[in-house]
């Protein structure tokens, strides 16, 4: 009964975690009620650190936020249907810049498949990004970022890649790679409420 109440009756409450608000992980805030009053205040939440803690990630590398810009063009793609026969492409290359509209932060580490057994590890890559609201551009930038920063598969055999927001990363998996993609929002919710995801 309590789980039902939390999942449905409090949906959209500013004092509970809003999974739909992960578009900009750097600006996430919770509205907190002061005990014994009707007064509320906003508190910034570090979603990156909170997520690492929730999934039990042993962090091996925590990158800084990096900004990127790019120009776009459309090219005809005969594999697409007639009504949408163009595909969005980069016009040039991905450019790293401090004030870039697209921002990424990667975290590398591992979780323990069996609690306490440090020999039974699941190697994880967590990709946080600031979304602009344009799904096609956001996903193209993620794809290009992933291609640019992918290391040799032998060096980076991740078991799981977590990423916030809708994405098409599974389409980039190469034949020798076996990683799976999980949405941060789903994994966050599952870890918080201990429910099957």
Regions found by a protein language model. Give the residues of each.
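Accessory, often C-terminal, charged low-complexity segments
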Residues: 1-197
């Amino acid at each position: 009964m309590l789980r039902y109440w939390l999942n449905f009756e409090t949906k959209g409450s500013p004092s509970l975690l809003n999974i739909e608000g992960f578009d900009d992980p750097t600006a996430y805030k919770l509205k907190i009620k002061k005990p014994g009053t009707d007064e509320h205040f906003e508190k910034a939440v570090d979603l990156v650190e909170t997520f690492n803690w929730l999934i039990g990630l042993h962090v091996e590398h925590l990158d800084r936020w990096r900004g990127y810009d790019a120009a776009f063009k459309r090219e005809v793609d005969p594999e697409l249907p007639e009504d949408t026969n163009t595909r969005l492409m980069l016009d040039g290359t991905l450019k790293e810049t401090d004030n870039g509209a697209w921002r990424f932060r990667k975290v590398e580490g591992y979780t323990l498949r069996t609690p306490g057994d440090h020999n039974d590890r699941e190697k994880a890559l967590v990709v946080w990004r600031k979304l602009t609201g344009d799904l096609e551009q956001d996903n193209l930038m993620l794809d290009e970022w992933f291609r640019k920063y992918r290391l040799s598969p032998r060096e980076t055999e991740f078991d799981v890649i977590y990423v916030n927001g809708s994405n098409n990363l599974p389409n980039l998996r190469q034949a020798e790679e076996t990683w799976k993609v999980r949405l941060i929002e789903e994994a966050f919710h599952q870890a918080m409420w201990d429910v099957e995801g």
